[in-house]
């Protein structure tokens, strides 16, 4: 089983069309990885599906970096 960090990085790479090695924990989805607002919505939806969780809009707005996504998932695992 992959770690949460590995799974998040894989999803980010797939959703944003970047190489997995470019996805490091400090990267911002918008500033560093070229995401637009639609990309970030789709990214949150992919995270919800992968980790079987629901991310409220007010929380989704705070998930702007790879590390923030990892932290959110870790904090909300069943």
UniProtKB/Swiss-Prot annotation:
Entry keywords, A to Z: Cytoplasm, Fatty acid biosynthesis, Fatty acid metabolism, Lipid biosynthesis, Lipid metabolism, Phosphopantetheine, Phosphoprotein
Main subcellular location: cytoplasm
A UniProt-annotated Pfam family: PP-binding
The protein's annotated pathway: Lipid metabolism; fatty acid biosynthesis
Molecular function terms, GO-annotated: acyl binding; acyl carrier activity
A Gene Ontology BP annotation from the UniProt entry: lipid A biosynthetic process
Subcellular location: Cytoplasm
UniProt modified residues of type O-(pantetheine 4'-phosphoryl)serine: 37
Stretches assigned to the Carrier domain: 2-77
One GO CC term, this protein: cytosol
Processing after translation: 4'-phosphopantetheine is transferred from CoA to a specific serine of apo-ACP by AcpS. This modification is essential for activity because fatty acids are bound in thioester linkage to the sulfhydryl of the prosthetic group.
Gene3D superfamilies in UniProt: ACP-like
Family as reported in the entry's similarity comment: Belongs to the acyl carrier protein (ACP) family.
Purpose: Carrier of the growing fatty acid chain in fatty acid biosynthesis.
Name recorded for this polypeptide: Acyl carrier protein
Species for this entry: Pseudomonas putida (strain ATCC 700007 / DSM 6899 / JCM 31910 / BCRC 17059 / LMG 24140 / F1)
Name of the coding gene: acpP
């Amino acid at each position: 089983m992959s770690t949460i960090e590995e799974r998040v990085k894989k999803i980010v790479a797939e959703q944003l069309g970047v190489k997995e090695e470019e996805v490091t924990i400090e990267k911002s989805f918008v500033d560093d990885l070229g995401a637009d607002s639609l990309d970030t919505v789709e990214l949150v939806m992919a995270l919800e599906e992968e980790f079987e969780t629901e991310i409220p809009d007010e929380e989704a707005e705070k998930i702007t970096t790879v590390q923030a996504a990892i932290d959110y998932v870790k904090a909300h695992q069943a």
